[in-house]
A protein has these predicted regions:
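Gly/Ser-rich helix-loop-strand patches that form or flank binding pockets
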Residues: 75, 83-134, 214-257
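A short, acidic, amphipathic alpha-helical segment used as a generic capping/interface helix at domain edges
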Residues: 185-188, 206-216
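Ligand-binding beta-strand-loop-alpha-helix segment within the catalytic cores
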Residues: 59-69
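Charged docking surfaces used in two-component/phosphorelay signaling
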Residues: 77-84, 203-208
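Small/aliphatic-rich secondary-structure junction motif
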Residues: 1-41, 122-125, 135-203
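A short acidic, glycine-rich active-site loop
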Residues: 37-54
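Aromatic/hydrophobic pocket-lining residues that form π-stacking "cages" and hydrophobic walls in ligand
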Residues: 2, 62, 86, 187, ...
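Generic structural signal for helix capping and beta-alpha/helix-loop junctions
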Residues: 23-25, 83, 107, 137, ...
Length: 257
């Protein structure tokens, strides 16, 4: 997914491989008995070997794909807490790309929702969460609630320059047509000021429940989504819409709360 954008901007892609020793060494409560420690040590050794082999394989695949696309690239291998490492590295990179259904392999992170929430709470943003299979981005749907965080998200997206040739639609959910018209007009003006013409749409109902079906009906390839203000207070980082998308969306997500 990132190859076309990287080629267009001459960007460098950095592949991050993280080994978490604490996770690999955890074997659960151990009963007392002869041979238990040896068995646990053997299990840890097997895990370490498997992870090392998988990292090497993934790194070679990443490098091969980058070379084929003529994209600058390098691989960084780190040891430690994946969240702390990601939070540190994001200071020196423009964007983080993670899997939509799992950020790290080998069961390092059990829940994608909690993992993304923790990453964003530590300042890892923007995040492009993608599926397992490559999907060309031909149509981009921006969900705009009118909140400050929602506006920040689409502003991040515009400034990134991603998918500049893809048609963009900004949709607002809610029952107040006048409020929707005002917000959509201002959002469209921001896009226009940065050289991007967008179409807008107002839908009744709620983004929490209707955004995914709307995106699929419009045949969107990417959803740009932020928060609602009330849910920001309740969830601190993610609103209900973002959490629902992370759990259920079959489409790639651009998140920058």
């Amino acid at each position: 997914m990132m190859w076309p954008s990287a080629c267009a901007t001459a960007a460098e892609l950095v592949g991050l491989a993280v080994t978490d020793p604490l996770r690999l060494e955890w074997t659960g409560p151990r009963p007392m008995g002869i041979g238990v420690s040896a068995a646990s040590a053997d299990l840890v050794r097997q895990r370490q070997q498997r992870v090392a082999a998988d990292i090497a394989k993934a790194g070679e695949l990443f490098a091969t794909r980058c070379r084929a696309a003529n994209v600058q690239h390098r691989i960084t291998e780190e040891t430690g807490d994946p969240f702390e490492i990601a939070a540190d590295l994001v200071r020196y990179h423009d964007m983080c790309v993670f899997g939509l259904r799992g950020l790290f392999e080998h069961d390092v992170v059990p829940e994608p929702r909690d993992a993304l929430e923790r990453l964003v709470s530590q300042g890892v943003r923007p995040i492009l969460a993608v599926g397992e299979r490559y999907r060309p981005i031909r149509r981009v749907l921006v969900a705009y609630s009118g909140s400050l965080e929602s506006a920040k998200t689409f502003k991040h997206f515009v400034h990134s320059g991603l998918y500049a040739d893809a048609p963009v639609r900004v949709v607002h959910f809610g029952d107040d047509a006048q409020v929707a018209a005002r917000r959509l007009e201002k959002a469209a003006a921001f896009f226009a000021a940065h050289g991007r013409v967008v179409e807008t749409d107002h839908e009744g109902g709620s983004a929490d429940h209707d955004l995914l079906s709307y995106a699929e009906a419009w045949k969107a390839d990417l959803i740009v989504a932020g928060n609602s203000a009330k849910n920001l207070l309740l969830r601190r980082v993610f609103g209900e819409t973002a959490l629902r998308l992370i759990r259920e969306s079959p489409l790639p997500l651009y998140l920058a709360q």
